[in-house]
């Protein structure tokens, strides 16, 4: 397991060093092709060629904001293989320390402080899979035909906004927020999600707000959902017990 990602990479490509550097850059937070090429000090065109190969191998994925063309200038890249993602985030960068036996210190100082952030994207994937299964079973308010993430500018707040999951059937939408944290999800998250939904698209027929939370919801959120059937709450228990 310790060397497996590198061994797999060496089996698939002829220049594992540059491919490994690209994956490491993405694991470290560089997601746009120009950011990645700058991080690894490689020509943008050459770097993009290597990125496309990693996408073809299923190690990376290409993503554009929901509703935009595949040629969008907002394209980002991520690590689709979760073993590669964890290994390059926490193992590869700490190899010298691991080899000195400092595993406990690495866990305390390098992994635990950032693990909730790391799990955020993993939880989004779990929530997306949950929605797709419920969609197949006809258990959602809409039968969506498309699902993805959205990010872009919020003209009202003059800032960048991101929606974890968007799914639609025509002009009817599911707008979703996924929270992997130890605190219960509160009303401020719901309010923020509604604001981001307007930044994404103001002209919608019907919108259901789906809140996913690792640690449940405050009473205020629960009461809000009981009085509004366009608010759907899903906690970790619901996901784990889905059959």
Predicted regions and their residues:
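A cross-kingdom feature that marks ATP-driven nucleic-acid transaction machinery
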Residues: 75-243
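Interdomain hinge/linker elements that couple catalytic modules in large macromolecular machines
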Residues: 1-84, 88
């Amino acid at each position: 397991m310790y060397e497996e990602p590198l061994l797999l990479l060496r089996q698939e490509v002829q220049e594992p060093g540059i491919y490994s550097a690209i994956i490491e850059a993405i694991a470290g937070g560089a997601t746009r092709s120009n950011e990645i090429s700058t991080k690894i000090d490689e020509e943008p065109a050459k770097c993009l060629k290597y990125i496309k190969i990693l996408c073809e191998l299923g190690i990376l994925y290409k993503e554009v904001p929901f509703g935009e063309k595949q040629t969008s200038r907002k394209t980002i890249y991520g690590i689709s293989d979760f073993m590669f993602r964890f290994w390059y985030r926490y193992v590869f960068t700490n190899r010298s320390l691991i080899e000195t036996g400092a595993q406990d210190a690495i866990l305390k100082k390098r992994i635990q402080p950032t693990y909730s952030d790391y799990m955020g994207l993993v939880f989004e994937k779990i929530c997306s899979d949950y929605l797709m299964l419920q969609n197949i079973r006809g258990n959602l308010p809409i039968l969506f035909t498309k699902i993805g993430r959205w990010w872009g500018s919020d003209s009202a707040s003059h800032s960048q906004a991101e929606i974890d999951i968007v799914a639609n059937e025509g002009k009817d939408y599911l707008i979703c927020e996924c929270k992997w944290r130890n605190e219960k999800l509160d009303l401020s998250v719901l309010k923020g999600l509604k604001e981001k939904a307007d930044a994404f698209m103001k002209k919608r027929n019907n919108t259901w707000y789906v809140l996913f939370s690792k640690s449940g919801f405050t009473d205020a959120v629960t009461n809000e959902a009981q009085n509004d059937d366009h608010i759907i709450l899903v906690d970790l228990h619901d996901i784990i017990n889905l059959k």
